[in-house]
């Protein structure tokens, strides 16, 4: 039995900030962002957009009524949780009208959790071949106005439908994971933005990649030459580029290096315009590769490197399925062009906008333009979401 990704969808917020404008406002050389980070834009979420609305929008774009009847598990991976008790997946399950006899829960381990969700989904489908699992990585990355991490913010969700006989990618049984207890990035319950040790986190990312890659090669017998492309977790593309160079060795021909570099360049196109979406960043890179690389063909093996601060990393691979191109959206760049461009002052206003409840725990919200799902009300401290009528 083959198991893998049958469908994949993506959603981001309707607003975008150009990093050239941010650099000017922060009195920074724009090339520090465009060349130093390889970033161009970042999506900005209004108060009516959160991990639930992004997740529901990403999944709604790909699911049929038949899918909703077959799905018996909904996993939402995030580090932008909206509730310390109720899983965001439960809200999403309801908004999508998925059949009731399903498990719905949330997973957390920084940017890594969506990979763990895929592992769990695969095991579930192995046990129950007729079932389908909806895995969604949904996050809003916020570091703070004027902080070093401000240029690497973003918002978005990637939804993946996992099933037997998948039509996009089939997973291989070659996962290798590593855990190390480090404090490179963390956000305590009392903090609204994370604490980041940037240089240390970069070191941990690259060392986790190198050591996990060495172990992966040892266990599988595979080498870099066996892969058509490598996708990386993308907190910002320049770090992933350093990662690619880290695993290139003298045994790789110049022709192969050129191929891997070209495919890497296709994998970062969406992230350059959306920014960091934490749990979804790796899979946004995968989606960008699949939708923008005309050289890929059925049977090609793709390696994926997942990293979550704290830290857990994992390397695994998947093979492209014949006809995968038909399940993709090749007009995604045009959709990104349709976002509303914000001035820096408008971005700052949205950044600082917070829930302002009355004494009874109530507030009504007006959905932003072009939202598919929106937070419309908080009533007695209970969040209400609705599909927005077009």
Give the ranges of each region predicted by the language model.
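Condensing-enzyme catalytic core mediating Claisen C-C bond formation in acyl metabolism
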Residues: 1-48, 147-203, 207, 316-390
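Conserved beta-ketoacyl condensing-enzyme motif
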Residues: 5, 51-112, 222-247
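Acidic, glycine-rich active-site loops and adjacent beta-strand->loop/helix elements
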Residues: 9-11, 77-82, 109-114, 137-142, ...
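Short, well-ordered amphipathic alpha-helical segments that serve as non-catalytic structural scaffolds
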Residues: 29, 51-66, 88, 204-220, ...
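Conserved catalytic cysteine-centered active-site region
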Residues: 32-36, 40-50, 80-132, 249-281
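Flexible, glycine-rich active-site loops centered on histidine and acidic residues
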Residues: 126-159
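A conserved active-site cap/scaffold subdomain adjacent to cofactor or substrate pockets
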Residues: 199-220, 224-248, 270-275
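Catalytic phosphate/nucleotide-handling subdomain of diverse soluble enzymes
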Residues: 287-337
């Amino acid at each position: 039995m083959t198991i893998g990704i049958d469908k994949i969808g993506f959603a981001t917020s309707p607003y975008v900030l150009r990093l050239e404008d941010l650099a000017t406002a922060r009195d920074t050389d724009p090339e520090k962002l465009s060349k130093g980070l390889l970033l161009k834009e970042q999506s900005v979420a209004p108060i009516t957009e959160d991990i639930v609305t992004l997740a529901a929008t990403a999944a709604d774009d790909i699911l049929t009524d038949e899918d909703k009847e077959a799905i018996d598990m909904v996993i939402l991976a995030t580090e932008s949780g909206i509730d310390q008790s109720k899983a965001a997946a439960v809200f999403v399950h309801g908004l999508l009208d998925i059949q009731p006899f399903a498990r719905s829960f949330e997973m957390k381990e920084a940017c890594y959790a969506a990979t763990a969700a895929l592992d769990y989904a695969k095991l579930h489908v192995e046990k129950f071949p007729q079932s389908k699992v909806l895995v969604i990585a949904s996050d809003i990355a916020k570091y703070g106005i004027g902080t070093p991490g401000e240029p690497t913010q973003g918002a978005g969700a990637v939804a993946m439908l996992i099933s037997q006989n998948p039509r996009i990618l089939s997973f291989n049984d070659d996962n290798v994971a590593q855990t190390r207890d480090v404090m490179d990035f963390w956000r305590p319950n009392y903090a609204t933005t994370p604490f980041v040790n940037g240089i240390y986190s970069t070191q941990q990312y690259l060392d986790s990649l190198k050591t996990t890659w060495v172990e992966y090669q040892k266990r599988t017998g595979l080498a870099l030459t066996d892969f058509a492309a490598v996708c990386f977790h993308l907190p910002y593309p320049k770090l992933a580029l350093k990662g690619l160079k880290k695993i290139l060795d003298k045994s790789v021909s110049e022709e192969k290096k050129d191929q891997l570099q070209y495919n890497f360049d296709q994998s970062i196109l969406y992230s350059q315009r959306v920014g960091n979406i934490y749990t979804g960043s790796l899979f946004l890179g995968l989606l960008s590769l699949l939708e923008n690389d005309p050289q890929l063909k059925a049977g090609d093996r793709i390696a994926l490197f997942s990293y979550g601060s704290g830290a857990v990393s994992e390397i695994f691979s998947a093979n492209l399925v014949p006809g995968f191109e038909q399940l993709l959206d090749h007009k995604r760049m045009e959709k990104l062009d349709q976002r509303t461009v914000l001035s820096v002052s408008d971005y700052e206003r949205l950044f600082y906008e917070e829930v302002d409840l009355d004494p009874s725990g109530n507030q009504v919200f007006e959905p932003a333009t072009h939202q598919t799902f929106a937070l419309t009300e908080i009533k007695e401290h209970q969040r209400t979401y609705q599909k927005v009528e077009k």
